Amino acid sequence: MNAIHVTVYGQIQGVGYRSWIKDSADKLNVKGWARNASDGSVELFLQADIDILNNLLSLCWEGPNLSDVDDVLTQESQVNESIISFEIH
């Protein structure tokens, strides 16, 4: 299992991005969380096998219909075994 911290930039707050990414993560069985940041970005913590993470990262660029993603930055992170689902914070 791998873990990454992701920051998504663009017109992504107030358009259902976190709910959309949760639905996508749940379908792929990705564990982690999503939260709005004060700078208008959305922060994600994702953990799953690397192929699944890469699939979800591709989806991060799409977002829901009303979103407009400008950038997706990733950073490797430590797996957190206590996270057993995907939550919106």
Where are these regions (language model features)?
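Intrinsically disordered, low-complexity, mixed-charge
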Residues: M1-H89
